[in-house]
């Protein structure tokens, strides 16, 4: 599972996830990508499940890049615990995703194969995404 090696603080405030992405919206490596069209949170299990789905479909051909990293701790108190007594223990690591953010990139496969593989990955994610190519990347979300 993806998680930071070390952090300055163990726990973090929830924060708000508003607006559009202004970083990670352009192609860096591949020819095809999966771009978020709505806001949400993605955890390390979802990132890994989607990566496995698209890697198995292309039978390890081409190259895949994961453009997101879960760097925010999400805490949870144990079940049937009374309120108070401090913040809960870290349960999982997540990343806030804003519309326009590129999640995965692919290269070295045909467009049809990349579209099908990224569609399989799309179903593993908790927010809406769309398939984009390097030529169509300038379209609005």
From Swiss-Prot:
<dbReference type="InterPro" id="IPR020798">
    <property type="entry name" value="Ribosomal_uL16_CS"/>
</dbReference>
<dbReference type="GO" id="GO:0003735">
    <property type="term" value="F:structural constituent of ribosome"/>
</dbReference>
<comment type="similarity">
    <text>Belongs to the universal ribosomal protein uL16 family.</text>
</comment>
<comment type="function">
    <text>Binds 23S rRNA and is also seen to make contacts with the A and possibly P site tRNAs.</text>
</comment>
<keyword id="KW-0694">RNA-binding</keyword>
<dbReference type="InterPro" id="IPR036920">
    <property type="entry name" value="Ribosomal_uL16_sf"/>
</dbReference>
<keyword id="KW-0687">Ribonucleoprotein</keyword>
<dbReference type="InterPro" id="IPR016180">
    <property type="entry name" value="Ribosomal_uL16_dom"/>
</dbReference>
<keyword id="KW-0699">rRNA-binding</keyword>
<keyword id="KW-0689">Ribosomal protein</keyword>
<dbReference type="InterPro" id="IPR000114">
    <property type="entry name" value="Ribosomal_uL16_bact-type"/>
</dbReference>
<dbReference type="GO" id="GO:0019843">
    <property type="term" value="F:rRNA binding"/>
</dbReference>
<dbReference type="Pfam" id="PF00252">
    <property type="entry name" value="Ribosomal_L16"/>
</dbReference>
<comment type="subunit">
    <text>Part of the 50S ribosomal subunit.</text>
</comment>
<dbReference type="GO" id="GO:0022625">
    <property type="term" value="C:cytosolic large ribosomal subunit"/>
</dbReference>
<keyword id="KW-0820">tRNA-binding</keyword>
<dbReference type="GO" id="GO:0006412">
    <property type="term" value="P:translation"/>
</dbReference>
<protein>
    <recommendedName>
        <fullName>Large ribosomal subunit protein uL16</fullName>
    </recommendedName>
</protein>
<dbReference type="GO" id="GO:0000049">
    <property type="term" value="F:tRNA binding"/>
</dbReference>
<dbReference type="InterPro" id="IPR047873">
    <property type="entry name" value="Ribosomal_uL16"/>
</dbReference>
């Amino acid at each position: 599972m993806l998680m930071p090696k070390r952090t300055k603080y163990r726990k973090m405030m929830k924060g708000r996830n508003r607006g559009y992405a202004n970083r990670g919206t352009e192609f860096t490596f591949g020819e095809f990508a999966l771009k978020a069209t709505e806001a949400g949170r993605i955890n390390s299990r979802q990132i890994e499940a989607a990566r496995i789905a698209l890697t198995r479909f292309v039978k390890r051909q081409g190259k895949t890049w994961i453009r997101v990293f879960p760097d925010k701790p999400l805490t949870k108190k144990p079940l049937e615990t009374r309120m108070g007594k401090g913040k809960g223990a870290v349960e999982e690591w997540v990343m806030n995703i804003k519309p326009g953010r590129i999640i995965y990139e692919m290269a070295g496969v045909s467009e049809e194969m990349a579209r099908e593989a990224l569609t399989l990955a799309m179903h593993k994610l908790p927010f809406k995404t769309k398939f984009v190519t390097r030529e169509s990347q300038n379209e609005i979300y």
